[in-house]
From Swiss-Prot:
InterPro entries: CD164_MGC24 (IPR007947). Homodimer (isoform 4). Interacts with CXCR4. Residues 118-154 are annotated as: Disordered. Residues 125-154 have a biased composition (Low complexity). It comes from Homo sapiens (Human). One of its GO terms (cellular component) is endosome membrane. Residues 24-162 are extracellular. Pfam families: MGC-24. This is Sialomucin core protein 24. Residues 191-197 are annotated as: Required for endosomal and lysosomal localization.
Amino acid sequence: MSRLSRSLLWAATCLGVLCVLSADKNTTQHPNVTTLAPISNVTSAPVTSLPLVTTPAPETCEGRNSCVSCFNVSVVNTTCFWIECKDESYCSHNSTVSDCQVGNTTDFCSVSTATPVPTANSTAKPTVQPSPSTTSKTVTTSGTTNNTVTPTSQPVRKSTFDAASFIGGIVLVLGVQAVIFFLYKFCKSKERNYHTL
């Protein structure tokens, strides 16, 4: 093999490695669609030993009439809890209520799940993930027992397969190989034209 052929082969190898490394960095990310899984309720046995003392709710929590507005973060220094009892649901700053469920995040509110809408040119399937935040539910009976359930969040996956990038990579590699092949043939034909005297 001549010196020029070895140099050309070395350049082609380096170019191929560069293409593989740069293709690894050029990945596309698609929006994540999150669905919320229902959380089972926690109940405890009623204890009737101590009377329940309640404090009147401040005006900021008392004026809110929906679960989502109860957790509005625009009001400074306000911690409100959405309380769901058998007969009524309301917003309060007091989390110690007998025989009711107390929620402290908007995940406690019943929200319809979003359905992913694929675009016309997309070949990747949407990834459905659980919400990264956690939800806490507390069931308090009149007395001393508080049970809190906090589910753990699963790690977020961002890997998707993009068919357009895959096909583009194949076309790029085949194009580079064709250029190298024709350069090699061109150099070989020049070597054959020269004759020693």
